Amino acid sequence: MFRPYTIEEGAYLVKLARSTVETFLKTGKIIIPESPPQRLLIDNYGVFTTIETVSGDRYELRGCIGYPEGYKNTLYATIYSAIGACCQDPRFPALRIDELPHVIFEVSILSPLTLLQDDPRKYPELIQVGRHGLVVRRGPYAGLLLPQVAVEECWDAEEFLLHVCMKAWLPGDCWLDRRTKLYIYEAQIFREKTPGGEIYERNLVAETAKCSPKTRRENEQ
């Protein structure tokens, strides 16, 4: 299982993402911390920052941007993915400073990508929902879905494959085409419980327990 960081290091990254966004929205400046944990300057993992609006017990995506295969180092990737999530996600308007008390920050640290080279028909058997994220690439098209997306949507492996193909603007069965390259990866995910509050590490395997057959049927309706 891919877990390179302690909860203290993960909390540092989530707090860094929030403080980076707050400073950027207030001043337009990107501040690099003076004395970060040294391993964050050495490691070079992929990083995604996700921002969600909280309304009661509901969460709505507000922005998600990142680097599948790293950017300089984990520290820089966190800083610049946070800026991207708040202000550069083309699906949403830029985050406003007054929204900060109402949004949750989540930072996902990605393992190196692994290319699947088996018979594509076997891919659903190789993908573990709650463990794997997916990347598809074909020519100029590419799409990525974080592992938590499949858990939150209660998808099975085939549904996960369909949606990552659609994310890349490819046919839903693109994964069956040998011209398509399919990659799997794992992620260590740190998240705020409340806006600016306590930070914890998500356990996606445990979260899949809510995806009963009944829940799946309700999601399909």
UniProtKB/Swiss-Prot annotation:
Matching PROSITE patterns: AMMECR1
A Pfam family annotated for this UniProt entry: AMMECR1
Gene3D superfamilies named among the record's database cross-references: Hypothetical protein ph0010, domain 1, Hypothetical protein ph0010, domain 2
Domain AMMECR1, chain residue ranges per copy: 8-201
NCBIfam families xref list: AmmeMemoSam_A, TIGR00296 family protein
PANTHER family, per the entry: AMME SYNDROME CANDIDATE GENE 1 PROTEIN (PTHR13016:SF0), AMMECR1 HOMOLOG (PTHR13016)
Protein name, UniProt field: Protein Pisl_1005
Organism of provenance: Pyrobaculum islandicum (strain DSM 4184 / JCM 9189 / GEO3)
